[in-house]
């Protein structure tokens, strides 16, 4: 890793900014605040007027919680809403078709604006719709879960699951802007909240150990969703990811570090039939990757025990029983059937990730047995 990169990250992270600008072909802002009403400022910044035609798309769970807020927006702006059934199992072509039909029936045009209000599933689906409807319309992303606020809302990856394979169909498409209010997290159930903490720890392991130290020292305040703790975590993770994607937007090399824990994590999600959530699965995947890093790079074993201890404090799982290794290996290797080795992101040390490290089946099974199984 470049020392210049880390100097930039630390310099920016210590800033107290509430607006982050993501550079690239289509520059956009991320607004971060506790106050939901700051959304109106973002609308003003982007010259969105009360008569601008907008279509708000969410899921039934978010809609039931924020129905009154949505009605308030509708009283000010020209907004029509649509919601679909909550859950990863609905991140499908069928749901996309429902959204396309809604837009067509309401005569959405090229100059219409689509608003995604919800977690990662909503953001991914709506982003894909925006990228394809009439060859591309503007959209605004308003993430409501910790996982979507710190990770999936930035980076341009949009898409849907196909035949059980996560994000098999997708594209890169940036929003007009992202609006984040940590107040959304106050209504998030504990399961979904801790789901995001797995990804927070990932950023700490691959990029900035200070995040891990912060959570270790403040875990009670984090779990109680204290506003200053949530702002620190959200802003820090977003600035770290911003730096990564600006260096490798199309995920051709360096950005691959963000997949730490995901190789095993995706297999856990698939074989558990989504009973293990994404953040939990990534957390488990990181434990396996730490064990592999011990075997391959001689990574200090104390880091594994440190993470295991932190997981338990945060309510994250440390075990997952793999009953069918053949099925599990197929889930890992579904798109690389003709290769014997699987590529991993591993750690030489904290903040020192290595990408595209090939690991054979025997090494993977050994690491699983010594860690999560």
Curated annotation (Swiss-Prot):
Q: Which reaction does it catalyse?
A: 7-phospho-2-dehydro-3-deoxy-D-arabino-heptonate = 3-dehydroquinate + phosphate
Residue numbers binding NAD(+): 120-124, 144-145, 157, 166, 184-187
Q: Where does the chain bind Zn(2+)?
A: 199, 262, 278
The answer to whether UniProt assigns keyword Cytoplasm to this entry is yes
Q: What is its EC number?
A: 4.2.3.4
Q: Name one GO cellular component term.
A: cytoplasm
Co-factor requirement: NAD(+); Co(2+); Zn(2+)
Sorted keywords for this record are: Amino-acid biosynthesis, Aromatic amino acid biosynthesis, Cobalt, Cytoplasm, Lyase, Metal-binding, NAD, Nucleotide-binding, Zinc
Compartments, as annotated in UniProt = Cytoplasm
Its EC top class is lyase
InterPro entries reported for this sequence? Dehydroquinate_synthase, DHQ_synth_AroB, DHQ_synth_fam, DHQS/DOIS_N, DHQS_C
Question: What does the record's cofactor remark say about binding?
Answer: Binds 1 divalent metal cation per subunit. Can use either Co(2+) or Zn(2+).
List the molecular function annotations (GO) for this entry: 3-dehydroquinate synthase activity; metal ion binding; nucleotide binding
The GO annotation for biological process reads: amino acid biosynthetic process; aromatic amino acid family biosynthetic process; chorismate biosynthetic process
Spell out the PANTHER family in the cross-references: 3-DEHYDROQUINATE SYNTHASE
Family note? Belongs to the sugar phosphate cyclases superfamily. Dehydroquinate synthase family.
**Which HAMAP family does its entry note?**
DHQ_synthase (MF_00110)
Q: What is this protein called?
A: 3-dehydroquinate synthase
Q: Give the source lineage, highest ranks first.
A: Bacteria, Bacillati, Bacillota, Clostridia, Eubacteriales
The gene designation is aroB
């Amino acid at each position: 890793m470049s020392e210049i990169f880390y100097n930039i990250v630390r310099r920016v992270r210590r800033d107290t900014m509430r607006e982050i600008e993501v550079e690239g072909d289509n520059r956009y802002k991320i607004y971060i605040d506790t106050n939901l009403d700051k959304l109106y400022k973002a609308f003003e910044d982007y010259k969105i007027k009360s008569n601008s035609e907008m279509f708000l798309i969410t899921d039934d769970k978010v809609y039931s919680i924020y129905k009154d807020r949505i009605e308030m927006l509708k009283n000010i702006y020209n907004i029509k809403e649509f919601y679909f059934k909550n859950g990863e199992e609905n991140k499908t072509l069928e749901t996309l078709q429902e959204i396309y039909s809604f837009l067509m029936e309401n005569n959405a045009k090229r100059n219409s604006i689509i608003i995604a209000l919800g977690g990662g599933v909503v953001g991914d689906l709506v982003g894909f719709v925006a990228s394809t409807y009439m060859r591309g319309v503007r959209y605004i992303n308003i993430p409501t879960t910790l996982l979507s606020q710190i990770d999936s809302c930035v980076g341009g990856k949009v898409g849907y699951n196909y035949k059980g394979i996560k994000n098999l169909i997708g594209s890169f498409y940036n929003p007009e802007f992202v609006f984040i209010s940590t107040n959304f997290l106050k209504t998030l159930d504990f399961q979904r909240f801790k789901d995001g903490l797995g990804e927070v720890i990932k950023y700490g392991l691959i990029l900035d150990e200070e995040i891990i130290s912060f959570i270790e020292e403040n875990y009670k305040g984090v779990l109680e969703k204290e506003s200053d703790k949530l702002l620190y975590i959200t802003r820090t993770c977003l600035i770290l990811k911003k730096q990564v994607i600006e260096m490798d937007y199309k995920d051709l090399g360096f950005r691959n570090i963000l997949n730490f824990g995901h190789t095993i994590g995706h297999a856990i999600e698939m074989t558990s039939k989504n009973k293990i959530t994404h953040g939990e699965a990534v957390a488990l995947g990181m434990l396996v990757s730490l064990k592999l890093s011990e075997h391959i790079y001689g990574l200090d074993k104390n880091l594994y025990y440190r993470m295991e201890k932190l997981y338990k404090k945060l309510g994250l799982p440390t075990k997952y029983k793999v009953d069918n290794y053949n099925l599990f290996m197929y889930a890992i290797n579904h798109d690389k059937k003709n290769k014997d080795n699987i590529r991993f992101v591993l750690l030489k040390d904290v903040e020192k990730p290595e990408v595209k490290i090939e690991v054979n089946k025997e090494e993977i099974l050994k690491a699983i047995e010594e860690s999560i199984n």
